[in-house]
Amino acid sequence: MGKHRRNNSNATRKAVAASAVALGATAAIASPAQAAEVVVPGTGISVDIAGIETTPGLNNVPGIDQWIPSLSSQAAPTAYAAVIDAPAAQAAPAASTGQAIVDAARTKIGSPYGWGATGPNAFDCSGLTSWAYSQVGKSIPRTSQAQAAQGTPVAYSDLQAGDIVAFYSGATHVGIYSGHGTVIHALNSSTPLSEHSLDYMPFHSAVRF
């Protein structure tokens, strides 16, 4: 009976040793590097196996530090949940100065025309343009002819929102170009402040301040 136990013990040790050698062979093929001691638990068997510490996924094997004592001194890998940061919301671009002028003028659409009026409740043509520009901190000449003469000339094809457009011979009327071929202006006492096509009146010139 005792002899039978010895035989079983010898067989177990041989099987364990074979497992260790097989593990070592796998590691050696995967990554030839510095040798680490591999101990077969419950036996006196230990072998040095090159590269075993770098075997992919080795640290995830339960109880592996009993086989490879050097792994017990290494920090266990930390599992991180995959986190995908949502893209930060893009801030809306700040309105250009020209667009801010248009926006100010547009708030007065429907206001009555008043000769010599500069707002905020009634306007004449150059009174509207002067008032709208003042809302963005810009001071421009008061009369339509002075505005047309003192700004930087702009070609019809290069008009941008906020430019001042003059109409009729002698630039006797002005309005604010609002984009897309339209102008906001205070036309006359029979027409409240409105937005019309540039073709509504004969074009004279355009300027930018």
Curated annotation (Swiss-Prot):
GO biological process: proteolysis
InterPro entries for this protein: NLP_P60_dom (IPR000064), Papain-like_cys_pep_sf (IPR038765), PG_Endopeptidase_C40 (IPR051794)
Keywords: Hydrolase, Protease, Secreted, Signal, Thiol protease
A GO CC annotation given for this chain: extracellular region
One Pfam family this sequence matches: NLPC_P60
Gene3D superfamilies per the UniProt record, alphabetical: endopeptidase domain like (from Nostoc punctiforme)
Major subcellular location class: secreted
Active site: 125, 173, 185
Molecular function (Gene Ontology), one example: cysteine-type peptidase activity
Origin: domain of life: Bacteria
Domain named NlpC/P60: residues: 95-209
Signal peptide: 1-35
Keyword Transit peptide: no
Enzyme Commission no: 3.4.-.-
Segments passing through the bilayer: none
Localization annotation: Secreted
Family: Belongs to the peptidase C40 family.
Name of the protein in its database record: Probable endopeptidase Cgl2188
